[in-house]
A protein has these predicted regions:
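Bacterial N-terminal signal peptides that target proteins for export
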Residues: 1-8
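Short boundary/loop segments of OB/S1/cold-shock single-stranded nucleic-acid-binding domains
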Residues: 23-44
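Short, charged beta-turn/beta-strand-edge "cap" motif at the junction between a beta-strand
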Residues: 50-51, 94-101
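Short nucleic-acid-contacting surface segments enriched for D/E, G, S/T with interspersed K/R
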Residues: 77-92
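N-terminal helix-cap/turn-to-beta initiation motif at the start of protein domains
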Residues: 82-85, 102-117
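Tryptophan-anchored aromatic micro-motifs
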Residues: 110-150, 192
């Protein structure tokens, strides 16, 4: 009897979980972006039982794989083990090219999924034409009732999901309703896709007015560059259960807090 490739794949998944003794389900690997990309040297797989601050027991997502143990003592000490490395979690590993038993970086990709936001505050629409003193005076003259109505902080950010899916957080769907407001919020680019490559986080974003078009293109697996999409490469400087710090190629740091797992 001919055995289908789907059946073989299913058996491999079952064996992976048996090796790791994990009850968690296997995550779906990210989809490839439509644009040409540099080679990804990161290995992807599961954290296995026996992992600690000095060693990562790892089961790679590939045929005939066996659990491997990587030395992560130096990486952990230098802050390049990102996340808690929980048994059964989906992780990415960068291997030392000069020592195949050492991981130079590991990132818990299950833990990075979720909703991450930062707080933004409104500013006067004509703030660029006013001095700081004039702004303070104008705010002081504003009745408390109007302050409560307009000076409301918002949470901007993104939700990272399975299969490279992402959605922006903090978008004002009814944009027209804010046109008569004396204040405005900082412009934000909307995250529509994410992935990890070579130990870095890649976020694909579009302008607010292109969001609907871009999301339709994502659903159809089309190249979102036609919607003005760009992909930013970010270093993950720190990640805890509730905090995420990213750094841009220009050296700017961005801090987020988790609002939903």
């Amino acid at each position: 009897m001919k055995i289908s490739s789907q059946f073989i794949f299913t058996i491999l998944v079952i064996l992976a979980f048996a090796a790791c003794k994990s009850e968690r389900t296997q995550p779906v690997a990210p989809q490839q972006n439509a644009a040409p990309a540099e080679k990804d040297s990161m290995l992807y797989g599961l954290v296995c039982e026996g992992t600690n601050d000095n060693a990562l027991v790892f089961y790679e997502f590939k045929e005939n794989a066996q659990p491997r143990t990587f030395n992560i003592e130096v990486a952990y000490r230098e802050g390049r083990v990102v996340g808690r490395m929980r048994t059964g979690d989906w992780v990415g590993v960068m291997v030392n090219p000069e020592d195949s038993t050492e991981a130079t970086m590991a990132i818990d990709l299950d833990q990075i999924k979720g909703t991450w936001t930062h707080t933004v505050y409104p500013v006067w629409k004509d703030a660029s034409k006013m001095s700081k003193r004039a702004l303070r005076r104008k705010l002081a003259e504003l009745p408390d009732s109007l302050k409560a109505l307009y000076m409301i902080p918002k949470e901007y950010g993104f939700s990272l999901k399975r299969s490279s899916q992402a959605v922006p957080v903090g978008i004002d769907i009814n944009q027209a309703s804010t046109e008569d407001s004396p204040v405005e919020y900082p412009a934000m680019r909307c995250v529509i896709r994410w992935k990890c490559r070579n130990g870095k986080l890649l976020l694909t974003t579009v302008d607010h007015d292109q969001l609907g078009k871009a999301m339709q293109m994502v659903e159809k697996n089309m190249d979102t560059k036609k919607a003005g999409a760009r992909t930013d490469t970010l270093d993950v400087m720190m990640m805890t259960e509730d905090s995420l710090v990213l750094r841009t190629v220009a050296g700017e740091t961005m801090s987020f807090h988790r609002t939903q797992k």
